[in-house]
Amino acid sequence: MSQKMMYEFKRKLEELEKYKGRGTELITLYIPPDKNIADVSNQLRSELSQASNIKSKQTRTNVLAGIEAILNRLKHFRKPPENGMVIISGVVNINGKEKHITEIIEPPEPVPLYKYHCDSKFYLDPLKEMLTEKKLYGLIVLDRREATVGLLKGKRIEVLDWDTSMVPGKHRQGGQSSVRFERLREIAIHEFYKKVGEMASEALLPYKDKLIGILIGGPSPTKEEFYEGEYLHHELQKKVLGLFDVGYTDESGLYELVEKAKDVLQEVDIIREKNLMQRFLKEVARDGLAAYGEEEVRRYIELGAVDTLLLSEDLRYERVKYRCPKCGKEVEVTVREGIEKPPFCEEDNVEMEEVERRDIVLELSELAESTGAKVEFLSTESEEGEMLYKAFGGIAAILRFKPDGGQ
């Protein structure tokens, strides 16, 4: 699924999550790709019969209307779409007004279950599960003093376990022969490696089917001894992607490991976002091919000067088009999501009417794509994504050229 599709899907779920209904009036119907449409229609007719017995007149009327609306939509399908579909229907409150909505959602992944659900809100949990980051890497950093095990989930690093060793230092205590001391030290190292292997198994085996790979970091020869000694469970051992030199073996070591492994993790979003922002900041620092802020970036897009558009997934603004009902004059303004402040037409002194309202991230991305520009979406879960959002207003661009006489 592309970044843009993922963003659109996420925004749709956010919109549906806001809707509330009375009692159990909101219907959510999950239809898997292999479900027979005729069987679904038959069950809905049965639900229609049962809904006729609902005591509350208003609830009964709204539930019956919702089921009828879904049945009407199903008439247009001989079979479910490739990934199945989810149909939502019911009377919701939108800006203080009640409105009956019916929508069909074709999710990015196969619908996992058949379910007919009535509640005061739409049942979205299986759809939200599809938004969870699928790229998962195991992280292990160790030396002979301590070890930390963690996960890289898309952009986030999570510590799963940490422990210290009982391995003595290299200098023996008085009264011990050097040979005996070295033997005891080797036994302690071996026991610690076993302990780290068990710690990794306990922390990472539950994720083994989802793990893309495992990265091991630490000083030499510790990480090599640990890996080559096969202290890891065989299911984890075969997933090791590489060994990397790191100076820290606590939580900060996990971050250092991800940085050192960036060639291996080139496609992981945390590295992708870091590289994009470094490229952008380099241009900003030398007053080069960079632009930020909606107005400036929009101007460069329209001039065909944008090479890569950087957008924050957390922007919640809309581009609204208004038209004067008398003279037909049109204006476009950007407002915070949900804000309704129609401007006045100065010539006719009347309030303008809303014609169109679009999510600004989608509007700008489509405008940029129409000029051949690349579009990159950054979340605020990474430091770089947060910088884009807070320092540059969530909208920035790397330019092909500066049409106004710059570089």
Curated annotation (Swiss-Prot):
Protein biosynthesis in keyword set: yes
Subcellular locations according to the entry: Cytoplasm
Family annotation (SMART domains): eRF1_1
Any one GO cellular component localisation term in the record: cytoplasm
Protein name as it appears in the record: Peptide chain release factor subunit 1
HAMAP family named among the record's database cross-references: Rel_fact_arch_1
Predominant subcellular localization, coarse grouping: cytoplasm
Protein family (similarity comment): Belongs to the eukaryotic release factor 1 family.
Purpose of the protein: Directs the termination of nascent peptide synthesis (translation) in response to the termination codons UAA, UAG and UGA.
GO molecular function: translation release factor activity, codon specific
UniProt KW keywords: Cytoplasm, Protein biosynthesis
TM region positions: none
Top-level lineage group: Archaea
InterPro entries in the cross-refs: eFR1_2_sf, eRF1_1_Pelota, eRF1_1_sf, eRF1_2, eRF1_3, Peptide_chain-rel_aRF1, Peptide_chain-rel_eRF1/aRF1, Ribosomal_eL30-like_sf
Record's subunit section: Heterodimer of two subunits, one of which binds GTP.
Database matches in Pfam families: eRF1_1, eRF1_2, eRF1_3
